[in-house]
Amino acid sequence: SAKLTKHVSPLTKPPNNISPSKKRRHSPEGPISSRLKRNIKPVIQLGRSSGILLHITSLPSPYGIGDLGPEAFKFIDFLVETKQKLWQILPIYQTNSPSPYSGVSAFAGHSWLISPDKLLDNGLISKDDLISIDRSRFNQSYANFQQYNDSIWSEWPESLRRREQYALKTIRELERDRIEYYVFVQYIFDQQWKDLRKYVNDSKIKIIDDIPMYVDYDSADVWSNSYMFRLDHNDTMKPTFVAGVPSDQGPNKGQIWNMPIYDWNNDNVRKDLFDWWIKRLHKKLSTVDFLRIDHFRGLIAHYVIPVDIITQEPNTTEAYWVKTPGHEFLTAITESLGSHIPIIVEDLGDLKPEVFELRDHFHLCGVRILQMGFYSDSTNIYAPHNYIPNSVAYTGRAHDNPTILQWWTEEASDKEKHQFIDYIRRPVEGDKELINGLELEKHLDKHICWYFIQILFQSAANGAIIQMQDLLNSLTRMNIPGTESDIEYDGPQNWSWRFEWSELTFDIRIRLKELTQMYGRDLTYDKTISSEDMALKNDSTSSLD
């Protein structure tokens, strides 16, 4: 695995000569608006299709990590060759760490993804292009934040910490060049992203992006909207609660995310918070085709973990659930952006019936994880025979789970293995023990990933996504939750995995294409289904949710 070390280019850090340093009215929670009642609009739904989950940083690259350059275009050609219709990526926000989920702005693209090859090909930009930049399109809070981001914002001078206007004006004047630099970097990112997306869409492929539920404390979002978060507003401005999840009923352990909690239930800020989310979703949907909202369960109730104001240590023994105004929130979203928003929701974790009721009320597309389908009985909603059309099914749980091969050889229980074997064997005598003369378990140690892919593609879920590591039968996972990369450690680091083109053999390409065509996932993706038809389709399995 390559370490996450990016080349030093003119755009990854400021040049040495730069000094360091109207509200909408929303419907109250309750029945859907009369406008939506009168018009049963088509709900955007993925047609029967398949694709690959691969973050941009995992593309091959001579520069340390993958970027928006030639290798990304080559990957699109591979998707076309194998009849794939979907490319799912992880968040592409600017971060100060390898994790794509630790963004310093929910509105700024990541400068590490800028392609040096394309900069060379384009000769950067002309003076005319620079003059014509519409600066209002770029996130000014992010530019202001970055120019002073040598320390966490709660340690800045009081006037900047609380965003007093005279202090902001002074900084803008004193650090004009540095702020303009960050605006310039965002311009370059936007141009390269537009070029790639046009190629993707011209190739009849859709991009799915992940949008985290929470944002980092040390971010432009929290700094510029601190009143919308549960912070110590009287003194330190540090979080009084952080987000996380307890252990659920499946194989997943609890987590502490150390991200501040939105002040969802404060009547004085709720409308502004909704507006911020609307702008965030609108921005993302202008750059990708579908959004997968992480931790959808948090819109029913969010798990709050108290923290010590002085030490900032989380206290999980006193953590608890707090109701979230999710219905009101999604009503505001649909009234502002339309009822046909292309959203996929991660309806996983410690789920209650209310989660599925909220999802289905707004006709949102859910998620199914095949790796979680064999630890329970036949009513397990993650078992492939229980998938519904309006869902996207994955081989594994994206970035936080072991790869299929690692799960099978290192983590799966005997019960899970036996249940999987019973699930796939044909009903003929002797088949349980032998396949082509080999013992079945030994056979599966070698071919488990292809069995998973075939079962996934056979399912009723309209979307089927393969994690790239699973396609390559790899043991290397993307991330281990609750751990951080260690630069002193010479082994695989979180978020550092990259594939090589030599791994995508002719056999893999042919087999993937054949399975895609065999199970009808190479057809058109621009299908819609009315909410009435969807109710009929899902009715037979809705009780499982």
Cite the ranges covered by each PLM segment.
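Asparagine/serine/threonine-enriched low-complexity, disordered tracts
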Residues: 6, 13-16
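Positively charged, lysine/arginine-rich intrinsically disordered segments
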Residues: 7, 22-24, 34, 540-545
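Active-site pocket-lining segments that scaffold enzyme catalytic pockets across diverse folds
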Residues: 188-202, 206
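Structured C-terminal cap/extension of enzyme domains
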Residues: 474-534, 539, 545
